[in-house]
Design a protein with these regions (language model features):
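Extracellular/surface-exposed low-complexity repeats and stalk/linker segments enriched in Gly/Pro
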Residues: 17-51, 66-68
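Glycine-centered flexibility sites
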Residues: 3-5, 43, 59
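Acidic glycine-/aspartate-rich tracts in secreted/extracellular proteins
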Residues: 7-10, 29-31, 50-53, 59-61
Length: 68
């Protein structure tokens, strides 16, 4: 596991980000750029700058994250 901002990352996480002043910035792209990804893996997440929404690939189609 990898820790960023921590010397003791959680053993339950592959990536543990710790900060009280910064956030996580996901890859940002347009719908056209998103659709150009060949064979995306299920679970892939991007921030769509065309719609200003989070998108994830469900294994067969892109969907909008509607509620967190």
């Amino acid at each position: 596991n990898v820790g960023i901002g921590t010397t003791a990352p959680s053993s339950k996480a592959i990536l543990d980000l710790t900060s009280t002043t910064k956030g996580l910035l996901l890859p940002r792209m347009t719908t056209t750029q998103r659709d150009a990804i060949t064979s995306p893996d299920a679970g892939l997440i991007i921030y769509n700058t065309t719609s200003n929404k989070l998108n994830f690939y469900n294994g067969s189609a892109w969907e909008v994250v509607t509620s967190l």
